[in-house]
Amino acid sequence: MQNIELRTGVWYNDRSIQLSFPDAWDVVTYWPDTPLPLTDEQIAERINRPVGQPPLRELAKGKKRPVVVVDDLARPTPVSRIMPFILKEFEAAGLRAEDIRILVATGTHGHQDSTALAGKIGQPAYQRCRVIVHSDLRGTKYVGTTSFGTPVYANAELPKADLIIGIGGVYPQHTTGFGGGGKLMLGVLGRKSIRTLHFRHKGVGGTYNIDNDFRKDVTEIARMVGMNTIYTLHINDRSEVVSLFGGDHYSYYPQAAAFSKQRYTAPLPDDADVVIVNSYPSDVSYTFVRKAMKPIRCASRDAMKIVIGSMHEGLGHHGLFQQGLSDRIREYTELYNRISVMKPRVILQKIIKNLFSRKQPPVKPNTVNAVSPPAHPMWLYRPEGATEPIQELEGVKVVKSWEAVVKGIQERFPAKSSVKIRIYPCGSLQCLDIPAGQDQGSGD
């Protein structure tokens, strides 16, 4: 048998799992080309030598109310790996851990499990600092409007802070090319601001272009609020830190995004019989497992599609892009969100356009090019250990046994002695180049 070791269970029961395949099968795993994990000495050096700014210990001198913005459980950033070094910098500036507020950037993601959050931030910081979990529905303050017309409602802690720094990561995003940088600000905004950003700007689809209006808008918000210092991490398929940028994110962000594109590039699964995507390290819930599904969306219609994810939070939650809804409800919800951010004249133009278009004779559907539903369900392998149940999902077959998956492959390809298997070990980190607009992933 051929054995492949992967990780699963981010934040809750992070562990190794083993996938076994018959020796005759053609199994290829597309591992990312990441460097070795950083040592303590390397992390300390990069924090002490930030890009375009003095060290944090100098920025923090004389400050009384610093805020550290960190991404939430929906992101795999191992904040605990660098938080001890950050606290040392504050201590060198004369600040105690008790003086520091850690603001968790949840966006519209809702509740955060306290035990998992303590593990992400690190127990010492979680116990000593004041940890505040952001709510997009309350506790925000209007701080202005961007040049794009986005009203900015930020967490009320930010206008009161005399120093704001961020800790986040750079992960592929269909909205801004990559996350991280100024996009970390989105997680500490009010619902109106977040809705406007998502539904006023077009995403970049299957490309990784960071030169887009969505990113320009969130970067402008970061400047407006004063989050000018961010520590940006890259991780490998085991959630170990392999790269760290710190300091002026406006300067270094293009380089950080280029690192992601270069190191995590993987080929398309063009000729695969079976495409297997491990959603770790974003397998916290089905909502965010979907961030890993680009190889699934790029696979041929006849390929067997398998996603791996523990999903300890079950279906999960997203205030704008909730999973598990019927197609009609999802369609109406998106329509409401889009209309809610339009200017009155734009709404009027669309109404007039619709009225005129209805007078045209109906166009017969092109049966040749019509998109038909998949012939087979996507398999979702949920390794044992997760306790939160998940509802039945249309077009998805959930299994908890790897043996059942292998049996399913054998039944699907009974005449093939050498089944062509292609594995993406950390799908939410990996980059696949496809034509713009072909891939429309789920929300943040």
Over which residues does each language-model region extend?
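N-terminal amphipathic/basic leader segments beginning at the initiator methionine
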Residues: M1-I47
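Short glycine-rich or small-residue beta-strand-to-loop segments that form or flank ligand, phosphate
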Residues: R65-P76, R101-G107, V275-N278
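An acidic, phosphate/nucleotide-engaging active-site surface
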Residues: Q112-F178
